[in-house]
Amino acid sequence: QGPFAQDVLSNIFTEISKLNFLDSFEISNQDFSCLISRSGYTGEDGFEISIRNDDVANFANELFKHKHLKPIGLGARDSLRLEAGLCLYGNDLTKEITPPEAALTWTIHKSRQNNTPSNKGFLGSDIILNQIKNGVKYIRVGLFPIGKAPMRQGSEIYQSKSGVKIGTVTSGGFSPTLNRPISMGRIDKA
C-alpha cells in the first residue's frame, strides 16, 4: 500500500503495472507464484497478495530489498482506513448493518439494485433492495470527537441539545494526518 507500491512489487514482477485497480491475476516468476489484486484497504494505491506459506519468507525478503518499503502494523492500517472512510467488517458493516446503512450501496451493481425476479437471489436481497427503495433507519457518518480522546467502538452517541441517544460509534482512533481523533458511527437517520 502507498505511493511506491507498484515500484516495490515491479522489482519482483515486472508486468505488475498492467494490473488495473480492482483487477487480479495469477503471476509467476522463477521463484514465486502468486495471486495478486490491485486493491487495498488504506485509501492508497496498493496490492493484495496471496502466496503459498512456504514462499512467504523469501517473498518478503525480496520485497524488503526496495528502499521505499517499510513495515507497518494494523494500527497504521486502521488509521489510514479511518481517514479514507473505509468500513471494517465486524465494526462498520455486519450481518445487522447492511450496505445501504453503511453508505455502501455503490458496491451493489446498478443492475442488481432493482427489485425484479431476476435479482431475487443474492443473500439479503429482500432486506437490501427494500432499503434501497424505501430508505434506511440508520446511516453511517464520520465524526470528529470533542477533545483529544478517541471515541471507540461501542461508545454511545447522544444529541447534544436533548441528550437523547441517537447512535453508536462503530470505529474510532487517532488520525495522524489530522492530528486529532476521528470516528465513524451509526446514527438514527431521523
Task: Spell out what each predicted region is.
Residues 1-190:
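Conserved, structured C-terminal
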